């Protein structure tokens, strides 16, 4: 699987992953809205969206 693995306002980068899914997590704190992307589907994070196709977590 190929997933995006960059955060918020950093340039888009991708990674070839062993996992069969990608995730995108969005949350807000005193720094503003933070978006994190990566491989797999970590269930410990809140407000996470998982998907199962290449480049699906932009």
UniProtKB/Swiss-Prot annotation:
GO MF annotation: an example: ion channel regulator activity
UniProt entry keywords in alphabetical sequence: Acetylcholine receptor inhibiting toxin, Disulfide bond, Ion channel impairing toxin, Neurotoxin, Postsynaptic neurotoxin, Secreted, Toxin
Tissue specificity field: Expressed by the venom gland.
One Pfam family cited in the UniProt record for this chain: Toxin_cobra-type
InterPro entries: Snake_3FTx, Snake_toxin-like_sf, Toxin_cobra-type
Compartments, record wording: Secreted
GO CC entries: extracellular region
The UniProt record lists the keyword Translocase: no
CDD domains associated with the record: TFP_snake_toxin (cd00206)
Record-annotated disulphide pairs: 3-22, 17-39, 41-50, 51-56
Signal peptide: none
Superkingdom as given in the UniProt entry: Eukaryota
Main location: secreted
Homology family: Belongs to the three-finger toxin family. Short-chain subfamily. Type I alpha-neurotoxin sub-subfamily.
Function: Binds to muscle nicotinic acetylcholine receptor (nAChR) and inhibit acetylcholine from binding to the receptor, thereby impairing neuromuscular transmission.
Stated name of the protein: Toxin S5C10
């Amino acid at each position: 699987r190929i997933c995006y693995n960059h955060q918020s306002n950093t340039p888009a980068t991708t990674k070839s992953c062993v996992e069969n899914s990608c995730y995108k997590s969005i949350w807000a704190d005193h720094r503003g809205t933070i978006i994190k992307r990566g491989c797999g589907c970590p269930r410990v994070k809140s407000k996470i969206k998982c998907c199962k196709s290449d480049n699906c977590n932009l």
